[in-house]
């Protein structure tokens, strides 16, 4: 019975319990809705959260689309102040700066003018108070004293007896002051001039080597610049003197005097040329003048002109050839030629194509004379 009753009771209880649970759930829902408990709110929030998540995803996508559009705007805002800095200042700022500079210049000129006017006003007019205080006069005081001094000078011009002594002292003082100011200005100018300081060359180990190398280079350059003098043989000097057509002694005398006078005022290179010319002339003397033949100087007799001229033409035509005449000046040689041979118009009109043999061949006419002027091998020497 117990089991049956229990079962029946259980069945009854189950039904009742089902009904009771349904009623309880409804009550709980009502109370939950009335009280607003957390469970119901959570469910609502979850629903709202799901909706919000979708909306936030949509918003994120929309923001991603808008970000590349917004970034250049921010960059342009950042670049804007830099561009404004590089721009030129506005016109008002430029005008203000120029006006300030103009005002400074004007005030500087005014101050300079008042300072000059203070120096022009003598101390006697300023009075003892200003001299004792040693203070700088104000601009108004300076103007008043200057006006007073100007009126005194005008009155003295009109009336010479008007405070002549006082004005004389003022003028003397101003003159002394001007002299003092000039001296001070000169001293200031000397002080302002920069004095060049001579820097001592720094002594290094390789300085001596460098200086020696530089001196060697300079000496080599100077040696290259000095012209080399070609050696002149005795034959060339004989030919040069023989073409002139003067006796050896007179040519030697004239050339030696010209070479001495020329060497005193010429360069070392020309002195060497004159020495070479003298050596050639001495060789010519040895050829033309023989110690055993004392009659060779008979060419200096008055009949020497007939020796040079035969049948109205000169036996020794002027020929120079292409040999250089070192150490000889044209004026001296030409003078000696004109004195010895008056029939020639110009002793330097030599033919350029004439050979030395043509000049020497004219000496064959001198064979009839008693003295031996030329040696037998003399023409061969010129031909070699």
UniProtKB/Swiss-Prot annotation:
Subcellular location: Nucleus
Keyword Nucleus: yes
Expression across tissues: Expressed almost exclusively in the attachments sites of the somatic muscles to tendon cells in the epidermis.
Record's compositionally biased regions (Basic residues): 75-86
InterPro entries in UniProt: bHLH_dom, bHLH_transcription_factors, HLH_DNA-bd_sf
Cell membrane is among the record's keywords: no
SUPFAM superfamilies: HLH, helix-loop-helix DNA-binding domain
Residue ranges constituting the bHLH domain according to the UniProt record: 94-153
Gene Ontology molecular function: any one: DNA-binding transcription factor activity, RNA polymerase II-specific
GO process annotations (BP): cell adhesion mediated by integrin; imaginal disc-derived wing vein specification; mesoderm development; muscle attachment; regulation of DNA-templated transcription; somatic muscle development
Record keywords: Developmental protein, DNA-binding, Nucleus, Transcription, Transcription regulation
Functional note: Probably plays an important role in the differentiation of epidermal cells into the tendon cells that form the attachment sites for all muscles.
The protein, known as: Helix-loop-helix protein delilah
Organism: Drosophila melanogaster (Fruit fly)
